[in-house]
Amino acid sequence: NTGVTISLVKGKKSEVKFINPRTGELITLAYNPGEQNTQTVNQKPDNVLTLEKKGSNVPYKYVFDAKYRIENNPSDPFYPDTKPGPKVSDINTMHRYRDSIVYESDTPSRFMFEKTMFGAYVLFPYDDPDGEYKNHRFYKSIETVNIGGLPFLPGTTELLEDFLAELVAD
């Protein structure tokens, strides 16, 4: 093994911090980061990626939540696509994470609370052998509303890798 190996303990917070050698920016990946404050019900996402960009006083946070299920019945009239993808209920959970996790703003405005999560993504078990998932509504929605799903299985990490590289490079 020539890479870094990280052991995670279920139910325990684990955090890895990196400094981008090209930019000096701090990248933090937290597993089980604990309850995230909201004004209603606290939320507990699985993984939170935080990017602290140079020249910005706002940390950019993204939820990556592993779900071990897939919508295999895209013929359901309520499913928004004809190909397999993440469950609609899991996409709704990503909306909840992104929209409900907030912090109290110290900037005087009519809105006292601001969102802390810039995006939220379901990691779901799909091997996408033909590469067609790029045409799926829940992949395209990442670009438009910063919520969606990414296939994640051993050997099927290319879309996630490309997306992470884009986040870090921005």
Show where each model-derived region lies.
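Catalytic core segments in nucleotide and nucleic-acid processing enzymes
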Residues: 1-170
